[in-house]
Design a protein with these regions (language model features):
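Outer-membrane beta-barrel pore domains
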Residues: 7-145
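Short beta-strand-to-turn element immediately C-terminal to the catalytic PLP-Schiff-base lysine
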Residues: 4
């Protein structure tokens, strides 16, 4: 269940709660709480979200938290610059091998009414001791019909 508020033009806030009940009485129910706030102005947008995920794998105390910050800006008639930062952590480090921060940045070019291409760069920064950062380049394509 969730609720969205738009108190001002361009400003949006959302809260969501989800419950996934375990079919096994010896295991815990999974719970997810997500919040979002964002603003869209003329030629730009910014947003942030926070997520709390309780009892991952139906195990009591296997809790994860994550947050993201992102934005975009028009830099030309058909070009948009965008960036995003994500962070995932676990309570007491139980999931350290999968914990990481990540950065994504790129440009999106609108080539026609139904065609967009977006080259982007991604950097993944694992939190585990001795883990190396990963660097990736992508090109995303959109074809609408």
């Amino acid at each position: 269940m969730g609720a969205t508020l738009t108190p001002l033009k361009g400003l949006s806030m959302r809260i969501y709660y989800g419950l996934n009940e375990s079919s096994d009485e010896t295991k815990k129910d999974k719970q997810n709480l997500a919040t979002f706030i964002g603003y869209k102005g003329k030629g730009f947008s910014i947003g942030a979200e926070y997520n709390l995920y309780k009892n991952d794998g139906n195990v009591k105390g296997n809790n994860l938290t994550g947050f993201s910050i992102y934005g975009s800006a028009q830099v030309g008639k058909s070009t948009e610059l965008y960036a995003r930062y994500d962070d995932l952590s676990s309570k007491d480090g139980w999931n350290e091998a999968k914990e990481e921060s990540a950065i994504l940045a790129g440009l999106q070019f609108k080539l026609g009414k139904y065609v967009k291409i977006a080259p982007n760069f991604r950097m993944s920064m694992p939190k585990a001791d001795g883990a190396d950062n990963r660097y990736m380049g992508y090109v995303s394509c959109y074809f609408g019909f």
